[in-house]
Amino acid sequence: AVLLKDGKVCVAIEKERITRIKHDGGNDSDAIQYCLDAEGIALKDITVVVQCENFTLPKRDFFKGKRLFADSNQPKIIDISHHLAHAYSAVGTSPFSDCNVMVIDGCGSPLDQFIELHPEQKNSIEASFFEINQMQCEKDSFYHFDGQKLTPLIKDFSVMAEQTSSKFQLPTTQHSIGGFYASISNYVFGDMDDVGKLMGLAPF
């Protein structure tokens, strides 16, 4: 969770830092409450929440319990795609006021969910993707940042690949550099989320 005030980061925390469980996910209430407590404010003081709720599935408790603001229509909640969240994270800590952003990911938001979230960006996607009946997810995205807004230039989607039962798993999306990197992580360390460790080996 990250708390912003007037466009500046006030406090940020990964849930795993609180629970001491590596890659801890699901319910985000602990991380949100930490940020509120750090600034001495309450939920009512928040204007808007921006989130990336990937792979929304019916009848599934994705958040593993009631969220901090589950019983209220305040603050306003805005959903954005997985790759757009990555892109804003990059420009938010970048010194550039005008730049291009490239996101290369193992697996981002599904195509149908992306269109539902950002219908105005449909023209950034090649028409042939809409002719494929299989599930497709964000693979590569290219944006332009003008100091205020991120505009998608090109978005590439890929069909989800079948996972194998062998130790060397296929990427989550076909033809994905990010997915391939995660698969190598799984081969070396037995976990597709250990890409940071794999990156740490690079100098050696």
Language-model segment annotations:
Residues 2-204:
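Short acidic/glycine-rich loops and adjacent helix/strand connectors
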